[in-house]
Amino acid sequence: MDLENKVKKMGLGHEQGFGAPCLKCKEKCEGFELHFWRKICRNCKCGQEEHDVLLSNEEDRKVGKLFEDTKYTTLIAKLKSDGIPMYKRNVMILTNPVAAKKNVSINTVTYEWAPPVHNQALARQYMQMLPKEKQPVAGSEGAQYRKKQLAKQLPAHDQDPSKCHELSPREVKEMEQFVKKYKSEALGVGDVKLPCEMDAQGPKQIYIPGGDRSTPPAVGAMEDKSAEHKSTQYSCYCCKLSMKEGDPAIYAERAGYDKLWHPACFVCSICHELLVDMIYFWKNEKLYCGRHYCDSEKPRCAGCDELIFSNEYTQAENQNWHLKHFCCFDCDSILAGEIYVMVSDKPVCKPCYVKNHAVVCQGCHNAIDPEVQRVTYNNFSWHASTECFLCSCCSKCLIGQKFMPVEGMVFCSVECKKMMS
């Protein structure tokens, strides 16, 4: 498919998840409605990952596309209908007999993802070493956490030009080259094994806490096979604490088999969240999730959340923006050359600020213009003028004077306060 056709195919999938309730805003949100170019809901401004959107197939397609043309093709399967690669997510179902008064019932636990290992006991042990609130048990808080991290750590618009907004043919080509490069140089999937199993597979080096990587003992040298020794000769690359050989460890091939991590320590070095499904990016001796690896390589637009492949973009408030996306967060009007106010790290034009965000003066009960001086005490504000910041009893101007605040009112003296009580 040529670049022109790829550009024409682009769209953000506005029908996807339409009307889904927001898990954060509850009834305050009318239901999910994707903004035209921002990756947020038009109604409540929360991201799609905050809404109860059924995305299992879409997420499997996204991860499948990520693994396409990599060494991890064993983790994907192409649908016969359209040839789209689908992620072969490993689902683990555990059955535990539960004793009852008359008979034995079966308690079934389904993990929406589990490490693809042949030894189910090892996978089970891996899960038990994760914080309970992050174990992806179907219908649990952990499953919701995994879903949210899939959206956050591996945004589709970081790998698929068709998920981006109005890229030029040149930008499409540059993005495809960028994706090809990180697939060949940084992308990896963690491998769960017992540390002792790697002796024959990886380099004969181990990480010693407080020391250098050691070389194997000479032929004929005596080795201490005691359990105490084996519990201290391996240490986690992240927390530096020793590991027991009987506990599962995660290896990252791109990092080298002399490094290993506790399951709960296999996290992004920037956001410190568990690397979802053990998908990692390796750079400068550090683990990254997909999002933060891309952030280390390319500027990201604070408006649309996409990587910037254009030669021209703007920087404002310590953030990067496509020229066309430096807009008011409320009304989408272009802010270049206009007065704006930052509200929760989002730029808002002056009219929208006055209408939606400005504090109200306790004196005149009008919104306070962002360019006008004001007096603030606790959660109350006044215009810093002789007409507004007055004693609530005698109307004496209190600018530069001592005052007594009482539930939104201010007094110049105890006498005035008593008269109003």
From Swiss-Prot:
PROSITE patterns: LIM_DOMAIN_1 (PS00478), LIM_DOMAIN_2 (PS50023), PET (PS51303). It is found in: Cytoplasm; Cell junction, Focal adhesion. Keywords: Cell junction, Cytoplasm, LIM domain, Metal-binding, Repeat, Zinc. Gene3D superfamilies: Cysteine Rich Protein (2.10.110.10). Residues 92-199 form the PET domain. Residues 133-164 are annotated as: Disordered. Residues 155-164 have a biased composition (Basic and acidic residues). Residues 234-297, 299-359, 362-421 form the LIM zinc-binding domain. InterPro entries: LIM1_Testin, LIM2_Testin, LIM3_Testin, PET_domain, PET_testin, Pk/Esn/Tes, Znf_LIM. It holds the Pfam family PET. Interacts via LIM domain 1 with ZYX. Interacts (via LIM domain 3) with ENAH and VASP. Interacts with ALKBH4, talin, actin, alpha-actinin, GRIP1 and PXN. Interacts (via LIM domain 2) with ACTL7A (via N-terminus). Heterodimer with ACTL7A; the heterodimer interacts with ENAH to form a heterotrimer. Belongs to the prickle / espinas / testin family. Scaffold protein that may play a role in cell adhesion, cell spreading and in the reorganization of the actin cytoskeleton. Plays a role in the regulation of cell proliferation. May act as a tumor suppressor. The N-terminal and the C-terminal halves of the protein can associate with each other, thereby hindering interactions with ZYX. This is Testin. It comes from Ateles geoffroyi (Black-handed spider monkey). The lineage of its organism: Eukaryota, Metazoa, Chordata, Craniata, Vertebrata. The gene is TES.
